[in-house]
Amino acid sequence: MAISTSSQANPEAVQTLINALNSGQLAQAESLAKALIAQHANTFILHHVLALALDGQHKFSEAVGSYQNALKLQSNMPDLQFNLGIALTQVNRLDEAANAYLQAIRLQPNFFEAHGNLGTILQRQGKLEEAIVSYQKGLKINPQDARGHFNLGTALRDNGDLPAAIKAYKTAIELFSNYTDAHNNLGETLRDFGDMAEAVKSYQAALALNASHANANYNMAEFLYLAKKYDEAIAYFERSQLDDWQARILYCLYKAENFAAFKTKLDAVSQQTRHTSPFIATLATHYAINFGVENNYNFCKNPFDFVYSTPIAELEQPNSALLKQLLDDINHADIAERVQGMLTNGKQSAGNLFKRPEASFRELAELIKQQFLAYKTKFSSADCELILSFPSELEFTSSWYVKMRQGGHLSPHIHEIGWLSGAVYLAMPTPKAGSNEGAFEYGTHGDNYPICNPQLRDQFATASVLPKVGDIVLFPSSLFHRTIPYQANADRICIAFDLKPAFRVASNNSDKNSY
């Protein structure tokens, strides 16, 4: 935006100030602007330049004040409202940022970047449908905006609309063929949609553009280890250096039965980092049982002691309105399915259920957060990282429903990207007397981990909980768990979720969106 001088201050002094800003001498521009403002407090240009200088130095809190001072003097400036929105976003004042973008749009309705940035704010606030509308408004103004299509794809994917997300990512790529993040995100969404062959092509396209792309390397590694190509997977994890890459390498070594290399790396990781990886805890526990050695990884050495089950009052009460609404939303809301190879006679939702707009899901999320706090209080005296490093911010890495029918079951697995995992039970089959059909079973073995001595199989203990409707079960994410098959002619419906670890910035999804 062009900057015009004001007669309220000496034109030569103002020009010197503008020259300092335009030449990148931001600290000097800041100093000059403050000195001039002390003498000419009502000169718009001085506050504007000061805001830009502060913004450029990442002094966002101060920049917010300067933008606001400038707007008090001249309020009909859409670019200034837009810049204010960006600065407010940087200091996490999201409601105010959204309002600034709305003001920019009011002043300039075709300001497509403001529509896009408003979408990112709404998405961060979990207002996915509003975010989608905002992105679409921006794209109606400028359909050639590749980044706008990318951001739309991230919101659609979060909202569980995988086909529409795939279309949005493909459009972004058509507009900008070298859009590495779009190729990678397209691959992730195709994977969730069950088209692994096309997903791999997308990862490879991303890596052809940027061989060091962390997410694409991670995703290729994940594909290779699922294909049991462990040595190839390790190389990609090494290149990714992303999130839990060291745990994934340990997994590959263990599944390949390269136990010597596994033990060497486990010891190194245990000595160099805090014991805050549930995934490594799973592997360390299995190795200790397998070889009859002590488990020194202190995430949660006795995970069976940390399984927690209790009813949620709002769901267990007779004729629960919340229970009825949750079941209605699961059965009738437009939520795409995610292909899940471990699930038999059932379906699993795609996207992040607790980010959806339905009030029932949001209410349940808040009730679950209360149970997280109750869990932490119950085990507050425990001397293990599960409790000592319990996340202070209660966020969900993921959330989804699982709906099974007669004969349904889920194979033993863990949630690698969780800290604390759990499920709330909304419908349960009636088991035969003395039977634990449909129960939640947990243990220390699963995923075809190698057992060196068949005589040790009984050392890998299991236990189970038979939940009632309205119950919540919480457990360390390091525990294997499964659903025991049931034969009753009834649905078994639960909503599962993971508490986000404090020590991981993000999952392996690269759904970064911004203008």
Model-predicted segments: where are they?
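Non-heme Fe(II)/2-oxoglutarate
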Residues: 296-388
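Conserved alpha-helical positions within TPR/SEL1-like repeat arrays
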Residues: 18, 22, 45-56, 79-90, ...
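Residue-level recognition of tetratricopeptide repeat
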Residues: 43, 77, 111, 145, ...
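Catalytic core of non-heme Fe(II) oxygenases with the double-stranded beta-helix
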Residues: 359, 366, 373-474, 484-485, ...
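Structural marker of alpha-solenoid helical repeat scaffolds
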Residues: 39, 73, 107, 141, ...
